[in-house]
From Swiss-Prot:
Signal peptide range in chain numbering: none
Domain RUN: 33-166
Main localization of the protein described in the UniProt heading: cytoplasm
Protein name stated in the entry: RUN and FYVE domain-containing protein 4
Quaternary data: Forms homodimers (via coiled coil domain). Forms a ternary complex with RAB7A and LAMP2; the interaction with RAB7A is mediated by RUFY4 (via RUN and coiled coil domains). Interacts with GTP-, but not GDP-bound ARL8A and ARL8B. Interacts with dynactin/DCTN1 and the dynein intermediate chain DYNC1I1/2.
Chain positions recorded as Zn(2+) 1 binding sites: 513, 516, 537, 540
UniProt cross-references to PROSITE patterns, sorted A to Z: RUN, ZF_FYVE
Coiled coil regions, renumbered to chain: 421-462
Purpose: ARL8 effector that promotes the coupling of endolysosomes to dynein-dynactin for retrograde transport along microtubules. Acts by binding both GTP-bound ARL8 and dynein-dynactin. In nonneuronal cells, promotes concentration of endolysosomes in the juxtanuclear area. In hippocampal neurons, drives retrograde transport of endolysosomes from the axon to the soma. Positive regulator of macroautophagy in dendritic cells. Increases autophagic flux, probably by stimulating both autophagosome formation and facilitating tethering with lysosomes.
Entry's induction text: Up-regulated by IL4/interleukin-4 in bone marrow-derived dendritic cells.
Record localization: Cytoplasmic vesicle, Autophagosome; Lysosome
GO cellular component assignments: autophagosome; endolysosome
Superkingdom of source: Eukaryota
Length: 563
């Protein structure tokens, strides 16, 4: 009973190890690596199973044989496993049979062939009895089936293992301890990372990972807050100011609206004009002129900074920085007023957000003014509520009209828009052509599939018809074989009878009775046997069980046939 308990305990521990691996690494999860504690548990259970109640055998040189010798003896008869055997034998650093057996287990786990290898090893029960005692679970049919079922479940788990380890002669590699303690204490090296494993990114305590700001709103808000701080009244250092202007220029370029946004806004302006809404053409022209003026001021500041940097003297004064800040705030206020008059339905939005959009989306304002400038033929009627609001702005910005007209008449921007539109149209045509080609390919594949389906059905029908015909022919051949067997038996029986008659005639001397071997005299009555034809005296023909005209031998055979 104690032996049965030990056997069941070994089988149960192996099942638990397999279930732990399936729970942690099954269903397409990450592969099992050297640092997995479940791997160490599984390898230990497999080694205990293969070493339990193993008979002691020694080689020619006196070395003790282990379960590797059993696996090698069982698998070398199968051609499909010669490559694995040669791979294990080619590892010169493994000196013992125990180390080679461990390497073979790891190789089968990595290739998903452990269950198949074990099943091939257990196909020959006589060989298994030569290597293992009666207490081994490998000799019990029920436990053997349970073990193979558990091992076949591991075929769906990926194992990422090092197949050429020189330290398997000593023990199984135990890298899971390195997670809790340093490698210097344990004395074992840390395993290398598998290919494709992401590298760790280490940050200091005060650092944070910065994600790219796609919208650019946080950068703009920080820039605006910095413009409003009183620290900007102080003169900036010459080494930091050019980089600041470069960053602002790059942010303004990266935040330019794409062509789709421009088309949407242009359609909105056209709908407003058709509905008779407010027409902010003059206000947009004034804001465009002010923006152009601020741009020219920024260029002057940049040129001054560049010249001073080359000469190595001077710095940018605080008044110019304040002027730039005031220009940005003025453009924000003008854009807020224009947006409030053009789109009354958008009053729920925050004014600060609209101001930031106006500050850094200068190409949007230029595109809108260009569209309004090209549509000079459309009627422009200003309502009375607009007259009081825009009259002051028109008087103040009357000197900036020529500059705005130059911006409107600039054909370079229109050419850029036309190029972008042509590129988008080309991309659309290419995508439509690709879609059409894919649809044609899909239709062809469907037709081919239908054709193949019809051919498959025809082949199946033909195969069924041939199968029925072959079955009929097979039945006929079976009947013929049975008839031939019966005829052969009849011929054999007839041959035996003829041989028996011939033997009887050859043994009986002429002039003697077949039954009692009596010598016939001149007056003795004699009768021929009606079956074999031999001469029988009157006593033998009448007294033998009342069978007349029959010798005793033929009478016995006839009795046997009747029974």
């Amino acid at each position: 009973m104690a032996n049965n308990g030990t056997i069941l305990k070994i089988s149960r521990s192996l099942k638990n190890a397999v279930s732990a691996i399936l729970q942690g690494y099954g269903d397409g999860q990450e592969p099992v690596t050297e640092t997995s504690a479940e791997l160490h548990r599984l390898c230990g259970c497999l080694e205990l199973l293969l070493q339990f109640d193993q008979k002691e055998q020694r080689s020619f040189l006196g070395a003790r044989k282990d379960y590797w010798d059993f696996l090698f003896t069982a698998l070398r008869r199968h051609r499909g496993y010669t490559e694995q055997m040669s791979f294990i034998c080619s590892q010169d650093k493994l000196k013992t049979s125990l180390g080679k057996g461990r390497a073979f287990i790891r190789l089968c786990l990595a290739r998903g062939q452990l269950a198949e290898s074990m099943q091939l090893c257990l196909l020959n029960p006589q060989l298994t009895r030569e290597w293992y005692g009666p207490r081994s679970p490998l000799l019990c049919a029920e436990l053997q089936e349970d073990i193979l079922d558990s091992l076949y479940a591991l075929n769906g788990v990926a194992f990422n293992l090092d197949l050429q380890r020189p330290d398997l002669d000593e023990a199984w590699p135990m890298f899971s301890e390195s997670r809790c303690s340093s490698p210097s204490r344990t004395g074992k090296r840390r395993p290398g990372k598998p290919k494709g494993f992401p590298e760790e990114v280490r940050c200091s305590r005060g650092e944070q990972l910065q994600e790219p700001d796609t919208g650019g709103t946080s950068c703009l808000q920080d820039a605006t807050r910095e413009d409003r701080t009183p620290d900007l009244c102080k003169p900036l250092q010459p080494s930091h100011l050019p980089t600041f202007l470069e960053e602002k220029r790059e942010d303004s370029r990266s935040l330019s609206c794409p062509q789709s946004t421009w088309e949407t806004e242009r359609e909105g302006f056209q709908l407003d004009q058709k509905d008779g809404g407010p027409k902010p053409r003059k206000f947009l022209e004034n804001s465009t002129a002010s923006i152009q003026q601020q741009r020219s001021r920024a260029k002057d500041v940049k040129m001054q900074l560049t010249g001073r940097k080359v000469e190595g003297k001077g710095s940018l004064s605080g008044t110019e920085d304040q002027r730039t800040t005031e220009g940005i705030q003025k453009r924000a206020a003008d854009w807020d007023l224009g947006q409030g008059l053009m789109a009354p339905g958008l009053q729920g939005r925050e004014d600060a957000e609209l101001g930031y959009r106006c500050e850094w989306n200068q190409p949007d304002v230029l595109r809108q003014s260009w569209v309004l400038g090209t549509k000079k033929s459309s009627p422009t009627e200003k309502p009375q509520e607009w007259t009081g609001v825009t009259s002051g702005t028109m008087q103040e910005d009357g000197s900036e009209v020529p500059l705005q007209q130059e911006v409107i008449k600039d054909p370079g921007y229109g050419l850029q828009l036309a190029k972008e539109q042509a590129q988008c149209q080309e991309q659309l045509r290419a995508q439509e052509a690709e879609l059409q080609a894919l649809q044609e390919q899909l239709s062809r594949c469907q037709k081919e599939r239908a054709l193949l389906q019809v051919k498959l059905e025809q082949k199946q029908q033909e195969a069924e018809r041939r199968d029925a015909m072959y079955q009929t022919e097979l039945e006929g051949q079976r009947d013929l074989v049975q008839a031939m067997k019966r005829r052969v038996l009849e011929l054999i029986h007839e041959k035996d009878l003829q041989w028996q008659r011939l033997q009887q005639l050859s043994t009986v001397a002429p002039g003697h009775c077949i039954g009692c071997n009596k010598v016939f005299r001149r007056l003795s009555r004699r009768y021929p046997c009606r079956l074999c034809g031999g001469l029988v005296c009157h006593a033998c023909s009448v007294d033998y069980k009342k069978r007349e005209r029959c010798c005793p031998t033929c009478a016995q055979q006839e009795e046997i046939q009747d029974t």
